[in-house]
Amino acid sequence: DLAAARVLGANGLLKGRRYVCSGDLWQTVDDGVYVDAPVVEDNNLISGKGLGHAFDFALTLSARLLGDDAPVRDHAEHIYYRW
């Protein structure tokens, strides 16, 4: 399985870091601190819970890249999405 959490964990990249993944996959990841949330940011690691949270992930990533969440919130509001 090439799920991001499993790959990152197997390579020691989740050690002491917060993350989220889909389903119960977190039970198979030894390193890291699982957080039950749609999107989790831990410094330069941004993880998403799954396809159902694609908007949350995309908006979070956009805000990070822009360095400002105000324009991202404006766009979310424009499509009637609460973020």
Outline where the language-model segments fall.
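Active-site-adjacent pocket-lining segments in enzyme domains
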Residues: 3-83
